[in-house]
Amino acid sequence: MLRKPKILYYSNGQTQKEKAIEKAAKRLGADFISISETDCTQTVGYLAKVKGFPVHKTSILENISAVCQDVMILCYFPNTRLDLLLASIRNGETPAVDLKAILTPQNCIWTFSQLYQELLEEHLSLFSNQE
């Protein structure tokens, strides 16, 4: 069974960029799921609507980790559509997102905030090594 590709996107308040990425998703035949600040405590699997990932009930005492940049998660993208999306980012047709990931069995159990932290650390490590 083939699953429909999805883009999960946290805009960090960048509404124009969010609209452009949503438009790119539609152009590629992918669903677009906007992630809100309150979604950041949910698992990536739940946000991507993967079976077996229930909603995480957050107490008012639970610390919501701040996600301070936009984040894109690509789910169920076949290589051909992934190549098209990356090409549209390279040619400026779709806005670039520094922190992006592909949904995997490993990261679907993480909360969105945990995945953000991992992506941020990788991004900072990659670019600090280029100096």
Task: Mark where each language-model region is.
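A general structural motif
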Residues: K4, Q69, A96-V97
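Intrinsic, low-complexity N-terminal interaction/targeting segments
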Residues: S36-S65, F112, Y116-L119
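Structured loop/turn residues at secondary-structure junctions
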Residues: N12-G13, F77, N107
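Helix-rich interaction surfaces within compact, conserved domain-sized segments
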Residues: K17-A20, R27-I33, L82-N129
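N-terminal, charge-rich interaction modules
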Residues: M1-F53
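Short, surface-exposed, charge-dense and proline/glycine-enriched linear segments
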Residues: N63-V71, Y116-Q117, F127-E131
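Mid-chain, well-packed structural core segment of small domains
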Residues: L61-G92
